[in-house]
Amino acid sequence: NLIAKFSGIKEVFQYPLFQKKQQHITETPKKFIKEKFELTVKDDPEIEIDDIIAKKTIEKFQIDKKEINILLGIGGSGPTKRIPANTFIKVIDKISKIKNCKFFLATGKNEEEQVILRDILSSEFSGLCKPLDDFSLREIMPLIKNCNLSICNDTSFSHLSAALGVKTITLMADTPLIY
């Protein structure tokens, strides 16, 4: 707060210090926003994508609506949050045996994430997979909206797909139990 005063900032809004332990991940910020700004936040907000953009994305990524289109969020913010490539390969194997599918592989440019991506793309299922690491979030979000399912590590892609209204399975590795 001292820096804020020197900077001429009149009001500072923050969570109480040293009280994060045992805070509920969504109820605490909702309460904070309600008290400080008199705004009510919905429990289940959804990100909307313009229909024209969604249709252009279908063409751009050659999405076939006769197939089951699945986002696989294979990246992660840290090595302990990332599920090994072999697990995703097993998922692709099992699902592709019973359904006609296409898998979109969402990850960042981090070298460890790229290893997972390369392992999947060098598997026998590479023809079913489309890497998304060269695309921006602006390009990827309409693609996610066109997916039937999302299976992701506990990453931004799991949160985005859920917020876009896509059925989402989040794979939890090293995540605190409070979440």
What are these regions (language model features)?
Residues 1-179:
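Catalytic machinery of carbohydrate-active enzymes
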